[in-house]
Structure formats: structure tokens, C-alpha cells
Amino acid sequence: MMDWLYRYPPLYPGILLKRYKRFFADVQLTSGEIVTAHCPNTGPMTGVSTPQSAVQLSKSDNLNRKLAYTLELIQVHDNEPTWVGINTFLPNRVVKLALAKYLFPELGEYSQIKGEVVYGLDKKSRVDFFLTGSDEERPIYLEVKNTTLSEGRLALFPDTETTRGQKHLRELMALLPLTRAVMLYFINRGDCTEFSPGDRTDPVYGKLLRDAIALGLEVLPCRFDISPEGIRYLGLAKLKI
């Protein structure tokens, strides 16, 4: 099996009591202590915030932090018991590591990786990654989307209406065909083998994605194995459009 792309720091198991005000989660640790952890996910976390679920927390030694613990993983039982990554700051870090290891052959050859490059019609957006290679190769604008919603083995994005995500699609479409535009869906759970746009949660996004694909947008629905030990890349999910 492929080596770990990312290893978690020591994690503390517990049971989720409730998540509230987006940024807070009350968790009972195995010791019985109840702590309030930071929830690094501003989305609705549909299907991945059920009370009484097993969770894993990291702990910071920074005494200036108001909350020492951070919610990192939650276990779901939609299929077999599966850990789901909650921390939305991790996908970009993991993708950067994967890009450095050239784990996505679909991207072809590139020699430079830049992050947070300004682009867009109003020059007010930043693309997650900008890849360049030889003069003969078109540059690649690559956007990463954290994906946790599922129906059975089917991963879905988004899990709620996302005007920001719609804007990103429109801006990537505007780059075509002079550059390559790639949408990488980071499937933050190992039990999904297929990917589709979440038409029920955001039909506008689904239509935009299909329109973008017709214009040449490339889609990489990337599967990742998530565990308290770390994160591994599993390859591409089947794209169902």
C-alpha cells in the first residue's frame, strides 16, 4: 500500500456530544472528561456531525489558544466504519505533498508549483495551485474542493449551496482553452468509489460543472484513505456526470 502522505500528530479519541456555532464541538474523552474542541470546518458537515459518533482530536501545546483541542476525524457508518477528515485546512496541504511526489499522472509534466496565485475576472480570487512546465505545455490552474458528503459509495460536492464554488467554476471556465483548468475533489473518506456533483444541494453548481467539463475543464475526483495514523492516496474515483 502507498506510504502515508500525511501523518497526524498524536490524537485523542472521544465521543462527539454536539457541534454548535460552526466552530465548536463538545467531546467526551475516553477518560470521561468533557472538552470543547475547535471545529475547523465552517460548512454544514451534512452526515458527518452526528452526535455520539466516535471522533479523534489533536491537542495544541500553545498556551495562547483558547481551545487546546481540534476536531480532526469523525467515524461514520454509511458503509463499513469509516473515518472522515473534518479539518478543511488539511486537503490543500496534502495535495501539495502529492503534487511534489507527482502522484497525479493525469496532470502531465510540470516543474514549478505555486500556491494561492491571483486570478479571475476581477483579479480578486486565488487559485489553490498554479503549475508550470516547459514552454510547450499549457500552465495548469488547479482548485481543490474538500468532499465529505456521500450517498452509499457515491461522494458528492457540494453539501450545501456554494456561491463561492460557483464563482470558482466560472473563473476556471474563463481560462479555457489557453490554459488547463483542473478541479480536484479531495474525497476525505475512504469508503467512496464514485463521484458526482451534489445536484440536490446545489443544482446551479451541478449545471456549471457539466458546462465547464464540456468546455474542457478537467475533473480529478481523488480518493483518500483516512485513519488516525494519517492520510494515503488511493487513486481516482469514477466520475459520474
UniProtKB/Swiss-Prot annotation:
GO MF: DNA binding
Record Pfam families: SfsA, SfsA_N
Top-level taxon of the source organism: Bacteria
PANTHER family linked to this entry: SUGAR FERMENTATION STIMULATION PROTEIN A
Family statement drawn from the similarity comment of this UniProt entry: Belongs to the SfsA family.
Protein name per Swiss-Prot or TrEMBL: Sugar fermentation stimulation protein homolog
Source species taxonomy: Bacteria, Bacillati, Cyanobacteriota, Cyanophyceae, Nostocales
